[in-house]
């Protein structure tokens, strides 16, 4: 299983929280102390909590569940997309559109429009339009792809959210809570951990820390999916030889 060690976390700067004056007292159980007015996160708490979160995501993946990676801060956006694609899952990395989960019916219509436009761009329909019409359609397609490209093949609501910054992505967490969708989230010292089912206390700004969370989660999910395929293949083999 893709576990993370304390050394990995120290190297990535996971233990550096925010300035002490910006802290959220609800994060007190996960804070080791302060240094130069910066809160230091207790990695002895973070390591097992992150590994629990990874186990849960592996459980979801091994049951063919859908995991939605959420990270819309500019610094994390590309890493979020890469990690989700790497493990065959889904992502929102541009902007969380209000109602993305709670108003799925409308989102589904927008996804259908995006797929229709993609088909039109590939089957020569755009070439039959006037330049202006083709440009309008191309721009609409690009805008929809930016907002919904990471979930266009999700085919329904996700089974779990993996969020990089609980504070920045509070709307997505609230929507997941309203629908009873479990939330795994990195929670820094300035954030509110309420509404997060699997809290990962850690730095949510340092790109090395963000990449550590994302890459480890992607590897864990891939591992679980590979094991599931291998188990199915061995079941088929047993049936064939009986």
Swiss-Prot record:
GO terms for cellular component: cytosolic small ribosomal subunit. One of its GO terms (molecular function) is structural constituent of ribosome. InterPro entries: Ribosomal_uS2, Ribosomal_uS2_bac/mit/plastid, Ribosomal_uS2_CS, Ribosomal_uS2_flav_dom_sf. GO terms for biological process: translation. It comes from the Bacteria. Keywords: Ribonucleoprotein, Ribosomal protein. HAMAP family: Ribosomal_uS2_B. Belongs to the universal ribosomal protein uS2 family. This is Small ribosomal subunit protein uS2. It comes from Idiomarina loihiensis (strain ATCC BAA-735 / DSM 15497 / L2-TR).
